[in-house]
Amino acid sequence: MPIDLNDGSLESLFTFGGVSGNVVDFPTFHILAIGNWSGDAERRDFSERPAIEIDRDNFDEIIGRLNTSVLLDFDDGSEIVLEFGSLDDFHPDEIFRRVDMFEQLRSLRKRLNSSDTFNAAAYEAKQLFGLKREDIEPASSVADDEPVADNLLDAILLRPEGGAAAPKPKLSSEIGSLVSELVRPHLVTVDEHQQSSLVALVDAATSGLMRKILHHRKFQALEAAWRGLFFLVRRAETSTDLKIFVLDASKDELAADLKSAESLSSTKLYEVLVRDAVETQDLDPWSLILGDYAFAPILDDVATLMRVSKIAAAAGAPFVSHMRPDVLGVHSLYEHSDPTEWKSAGDSDTAKLWSALVGQTESQALGMTIPRFITRLPYGSDTEPLDTFMFEEFESASEHDNYLWSNGCFAVAQMLADSFANYGWEMKDRLTQDIDGLPLHIYKADGETVYKACAEIPMTDVGVNKLLEAGLMPLASYRGTDRIRLAMYQSITGSALRGRW
């Protein structure tokens, strides 16, 4: 039925159907990270997926067990499928070794660097890179283009009917349009003797293709998820009392689960968070739920958060995720870092949706972080050089959207895990709020040394206070350092985040 934003009907849609759970405190601190861990892999129905324990020792095993993969589609219609069996498989060195397109470019480069195969390879390269017809015709004699054979019989067998050996295309048609687009800015008029120019084009194509992969929105999302989780797993002192689990679910799957059932107590999320852990006590109760998603103040997202918060409250564990800057009236914090540009929604539908969410009691179990934080440096000679080829991930000094930004929920989880490891359940008044040792990108811009903020933007006190007033959990960068600070553990209602502590 249609939702009237003025009569509070949004909240009334989400009920447990009469079921309630009483939370019993246990000495364990269990974290559940829900996210799209398997990417584009085929998987069982969400209702059949278990929560899986993960730690430093089995981290790569879990990546493989989930058959983690991603299908990257490009504007020219080409596609690349990447499969991951470990965190290292996200590294450009491994991608370079495993992706067939790079093998074809490696082969072409090797043949261009050999005097025995240069002429045929040059002809092939010019076709691939779309040089003019007159530049494609070999300038040297036919004999120079013939493949070199160990003996006369081999030479004869290698010739096509009619005599001279013709260059054989070795690169697939799939790579053709993609590579020609990548190298177009680097094209120069060449002949067969300009070996270095052709090799440079191959290198430009190789780097361009790698950038397209690393910066593809789907690859970035999957890498940011796993590196954010690894940040948490690597730093948390897991033990019999402190454990981390993952539940594989895309944002759409989570939303569908929550809205498809007649009551929230019939959902998969309720089963995992409440029924198994609280009502039947088959599992220890959860202490913290992470949602590796980005939410905006739109109807579908607010409806999902309302349902999640009710289940989280019943489980006695807060749900922490990320709120997009749209809630502040801007699309990007980086492009609008001045807090005076952040506006409230006024009397708009967005404001009514947000008010409905904030107004429900269970939202005290809902914490939304902003901004994101960095989980790896850009690749390059001055930061993280590759072993396989010379590669600069950024073509300019700094490309904000192409950094790897992970969900702030992982930072919050690490701080809470640290607090529990140090103080146990007596941590309430001694919660960790700082993280250091983050990747710090230092670069030159207009002759000046620049330190990239580890949490997207340099945050001022005014900015922090404005985010707190909006009910968010700000992650603030310490200027010129590898540290960030969580301003406050608060719910979107402005009250303290409701947790077992």
Predicted regions and their residues:
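Short, glycine/acidic-rich hinge or "gate" loops at secondary-structure transitions
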Residues: 119-126, 217-224, 329-330
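Short, well-ordered alpha-helical packing segments
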Residues: 106-109, 176, 203-211, 223-230, ...
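A glycine- and small-residue-enriched flexible loop/hinge signal that marks low-structured segments
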Residues: 137-194, 214, 234-237, 248-249, ...
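Compact, well-ordered interaction domains used in eukaryotic information-processing assemblies
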Residues: 2-94
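Extended assembly-interface regions of large multimeric machines
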Residues: 187, 196-259
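Long, charged, helix-rich clamp/arm modules that form nucleic acid-engaging surfaces
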Residues: 69-195, 202-206
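Well-ordered, non-membrane alpha-helical segments in soluble/globular domains
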Residues: 223-226, 260-275, 300-311
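A short, well-structured beta->alpha microelement
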Residues: 244-280
